[in-house]
């Protein structure tokens, strides 16, 4: 085993990387409220794992979406547990994200030189809410359908481009299969990749600049 480790160590300097990660200075003023961002990340990882599991059974069509969700809940082994964890961790992720934003704001973590860290955090907050909006529609039940209809109709109030934005979101003049397909694509592909990119940027900035000091 040591020979295997030595082989990787010689090429990748694993120990130096581990020492850099574990030896980062933590200011004495840091308390449990500084863990809210990490908890949000943990919720996202749970979301990713449970969501990925459900993609094996979910069918993104207006005719089969609701039935496929019922199949997950009633027929798939531990499907009810996987979907329940997905649902509750989604709520927890939004709550922890909101508390994290408040903590950063109240402790002045957005001030120079951490403005870009704050900007990426705001983008992450928007993406998190977008996850909730798109995911809410996927069961395609009465609640999901009318939620999509209301949310996708909101841009209509924007002058000049409002109607075009509504049609872009819905994939047509009315809510239907094209809408569900777009929301499913956003929820399972576009938003996950987007949040991964901005999370990486966010964490690299935190790693570089460290945790902000006390007020």
Swiss-Prot record:
InterPro entries: Cyt_b/b6_N, Cyt_B6_PetB, Cytb/b6-like_sf, Cytochrome_b_N_euk/bac, Di-haem_cyt_TM. Heme b 1 binds at residues 100, 202. Its cofactor is heme b; heme c. The chain crosses the membrane at residues 32-52, 90-110, 116-136, 186-206. It is found in: Cellular thylakoid membrane. Binds 2 heme b groups non-covalently with two histidine residues as axial ligands. The 4 large subunits of the cytochrome b6-f complex are cytochrome b6, subunit IV (17 kDa polypeptide, PetD), cytochrome f and the Rieske protein, while the 4 small subunits are PetG, PetL, PetM and PetN. The complex functions as a dimer. Belongs to the cytochrome b family. PetB subfamily. HAMAP family: Cytb6_f_cytb6. This is Cytochrome b6. It comes from Thermosynechococcus vestitus (strain NIES-2133 / IAM M-273 / BP-1).
């Amino acid at each position: 085993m040591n020979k295997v480790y030595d082989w990787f160590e010689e090429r990748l300097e694993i120990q130096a990387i581990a020492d850099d990660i574990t030896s980062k200075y933590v200011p004495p003023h840091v308390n449990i409220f500084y863990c809210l961002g990490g908890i949000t990340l943990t919720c996202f990882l749970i979301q990713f794992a449970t969501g990925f599991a459900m993609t094996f059974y979910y069918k993104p069509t207006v005719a089969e979406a609701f039935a496929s969700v019922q199949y997950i809940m009633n027929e798939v082994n531990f499907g009810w547990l996987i979907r329940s964890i997905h649902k509750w961790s989604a709520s927890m992720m939004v709550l922890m994200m909101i508390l994290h934003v408040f903590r950063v704001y109240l402790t002045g973590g957005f001030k120079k030189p951490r403005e870009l860290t704050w900007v990426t955090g705001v983008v992450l907050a928007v993406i998190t809410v977008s996850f909730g909006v798109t995911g809410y529609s996927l069961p395609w039940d009465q609640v999901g359908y009318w939620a999509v209809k209301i949310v996708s109709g909101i841009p209509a109030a924007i002058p000049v481009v409002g109607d075009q934005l509504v049609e872009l979101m819905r994939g047509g003049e009315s809510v239907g299969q094209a809408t569900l397909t777009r929301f499913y694509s956003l929820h399972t592909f576009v938003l996950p990749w987007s949040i991964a990119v901005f999370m990486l940027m966010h964490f690299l900035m935190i790693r570089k600049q460290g945790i902000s000091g006390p007020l």
